[in-house]
Amino acid sequence: VQTWRGFDFNGHFADWKNQLTEYCSGDYIFQIDADEIPHQVLLGYLPEILGNNPDNEVYLVPRINTVEGITDEHIKKWGWNVNDKGWVNYPDYQWRIWKNKPEIKWKNKVHEVLEGFKTYAPIPSTEQLSLYHPKTIDRQEKQNAYYNTL
């Protein structure tokens, strides 16, 4: 039986994520944002990656960002790099997988990072081992404006 829990968001992303992880019961936590899509190959390889590296506590997962409608003006304004595939800031590593240990916690109100671990490693930056993170320019601008209010 699954129990769904709702939490009021207080404008502090790390506090919110830390509250949610208290309900996790597995050996590892794989936390992705609502707008991120893991590649099926990544999902298939996770047991092998985790099993082959039992001493590693945290994994950084590469993320493919795409922004429909982005212009050279946006790229320059935000200091982004866009490759020939249209991927923004690739591999844009994200803290997404970690051992479920009470000392590993999120910090920072916005653009959160994990703390309380000793070992970490990046997952190789290939398309098949990445998260896909599609956006529109309208959504990106609204998100930037919202983050500026926090």
Predicted feature locations:
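Acidic donor-binding segment of Leloir-type glycosyltransferases
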Residues: 1-10, 19
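Catalytic-site signature of metal-activated, phosphate-bearing donor transferases
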Residues: 11-21, 28, 39-150
